[in-house]
């Protein structure tokens, strides 16, 4: 059993009786993390992380002020964020001093240990997508332009359809040129039903029709695309609030998921987006895309630290299989695979 696996197991809750809803969730294989995707998709982040940690472990035999400054700088560069980096750095230095550690591998293990403990903070996040049994589940996809919002929706629709679920896509991005055609093409490729906007119809009206149709025809899932909006445009953000209220009115409940799609390569800009979107609507989770192109895997810690929001899905590439459920253990294994920790054999 690997060092990482042992560490994660300490925080896993004891198994409870599985009720109908939990069982429905567990039966859906699209919620499972793909270990191979994590190992291959996190190559850039893993190389960056290993270079950072190996350099620190090799350059400092004693834990002094210079070590602490270097550690803090490296954590910030990994996009962990100033607040989280400060707390994690203090915890690492305290532990290293307490144990009087000078062995480079032990230094690596303590750094990884404190990163995981900080993310978990006494309990594991619920990262499964919410699925209510015997009900139409409505998912809203929100975010700025260019983050992979429409593509992520289509990839999830494909995975759900392959599980024999009835899925209705709603092409609510009426602003971006080509967005409707893009989703319509995906629908044809997947074999999935879609609600398209009428001429000059705005996003809230399209979402209203789509959710209404999904409920009336007893679809399992209604996946709603929305127009990309800049977080500094108040009128667009207010429209998002209106869309959220429309779903509540039509379905007599909040959307099962309101997912903010973030580009994993944008770093602190993504955090600024999350802050504003979270103010205008009740986000339930994050979809982190383009992680195969990112060298800064620490953004997941920053999201957890600032907003207490779970990353629910993570994207590593172009195919539909490259959108995976977020799994902390697989993520950490992928991120630390180039360190000399006690890993299980690498997946290639």
UniProtKB/Swiss-Prot annotation:
Which residues take part in binding GTP? 143-150, 225-229, 289-292
Q: Which domain of life is it from?
A: Bacteria
Query: Coiled coil located at which positions?
Result: none
InterPro entries attached to this UniProt entry: AAA+_ATPase, P-loop_NTPase, Signal_recog_particl_SRP54_hlx, SR_rcpt_FtsY, SRP/SRP_N, SRP54_GTPase_dom, SRP54_N_sf
The EC number of this protein is: 3.6.5.4
Q: Which Pfam families match?
A: SRP54, SRP54_N
Going by the record, the broad EC class of this enzyme is hydrolase
Principal place where this protein is found?
A: membrane
Mention one GO molecular function: signal recognition particle binding
Q: Indicate yes or no for the key word Hydrolase.
A: yes
Q: How does it sit in the membrane?
A: Peripheral membrane protein
Please provide the record's keywords in A-Z order.
Answer: Cell membrane, Cytoplasm, GTP-binding, Hydrolase, Membrane, Nucleotide-binding, Receptor
Reaction(s) catalysed (UniProt annotation):
GTP + H2O = GDP + phosphate + H(+)
GO-annotated cellular components: cytoplasm; plasma membrane
Q: Which GO annotations describe the biological process of this protein?
A: SRP-dependent cotranslational protein targeting to membrane
Q: What does the UniProt entry say about where the protein is found?
A: Cell membrane; Cytoplasm
What the protein does comes down to: Involved in targeting and insertion of nascent membrane proteins into the cytoplasmic membrane. Acts as a receptor for the complex formed by the signal recognition particle (SRP) and the ribosome-nascent chain (RNC).
Family, according to the entry, reads as follows: Belongs to the GTP-binding SRP family. FtsY subfamily.
Q: How does it assemble?
A: Part of the signal recognition particle protein translocation system, which is composed of SRP and FtsY.
Tell me the protein's name.
Signal recognition particle receptor FtsY
Q: Which organism is it from?
A: Mycoplasma pneumoniae (strain ATCC 29342 / M129 / Subtype 1)
Q: Which gene encodes it?
A: ftsY
